Amino acid sequence: MTLVAKSHDRHVDLALKTHLDENLAMIKDSIEFLRKGGQRVFLDAEHFFDGYRSNPAYALEVVRTAAEAGADVIALCDTNGGMLPDELSSVVHDVLQKSSARLGIHCHNDTGCAIANSLAAVAAGATHVQGTLNGYGERTGNADLVSIIANLQLKKKQQVLPQGALEEAFRISHAVAEVTNVAPSARQPYVGVSAFAHKAGLHASAIKVDPALYQHEDPESVGNDMRMLVSDMAGRASIELKSQELGIDLSQEKEVVSRVVERVKAMESRGYTFEAADASFELLLREEL
């Protein structure tokens, strides 16, 4: 069971229109009631970080009261999304030093830092992270669990999912986008269709030698694929790699590759585009074979 409680003194006064002590009593009574009924209790301390700036003693008292009443996790909420990672990390560390609570983190993305703030909280000692798939949420969104989980597991080597589950990230992210009728972002970290896409000829030449030269992780680790884009920036390596994706080996067809490169550049200069038109590129390619 998740409860939401005010931890900012100004919100208690102006939004709840009650006394600070009464707010603490309501938190205590609610948690104890649920615990007696056998419920696990998660408390979301709303506006915690803004409250900590305003009145740190009271914000800490909310955490202590909830912990003593038996809350399993107290999630510190950056409800307005205005925190930056360095300050947030310092606050989480301070709270852990001054209470015995098991802390979680709940971030909004109003500064574009929801993912970074969540990771900073974990590094500071939080053991519970709240967020949403693809970062969906009010205003500018919540912390994207897809990126958070991938970062924790791939970068921090923390096994937060069962073995092999992370490889479902791409499929799940896009399934959720379809169900919610929200167009997926091509540039979403890890699972966007452009996350491991390459266009520049220099990149393609290096990727032929070793994909890790221009990729921070193996795209298969999150169920994604490397994509080679064909455009007016394409060189011979780009054309050869894209052709391999389509099942056509041009490694011994240097003249064909040269003609395809020139045709692509000429057509793109007239307004055509091949980046998301694999079938059109394949037709052009087969015309030159």
Task: Give residue ranges: language-model regions.
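Glycine-rich phosphate-binding loop at the start of an alpha helix
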Residues: L60, G112-A116, N142
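Contiguous mid-protein beta-loop-alpha structural module that forms a pocket-lining wall or clamp
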Residues: V129, A143-V146, L152-Q158
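Small-aliphatic-rich amphipathic alpha-helix that forms the alpha element of a beta-alpha
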Residues: D110-L133
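Histidine/acidic-residue-rich catalytic or RNA/ligand-binding cores of hydrolases
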Residues: L88, T140-S147
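A mid-to-C-terminal "edge-of-domain" accessory segment
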Residues: A150, K156-L289
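Hydrophobic alpha-helical scaffolding
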Residues: L20, F49-Y52, P56, D78-P85, ...
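Short glycine/serine- and small hydrophobic-enriched flexible loop segments
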Residues: A120-A123, A150-L154
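Alpha/beta enzyme core
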Residues: T2-L103, S118-A126
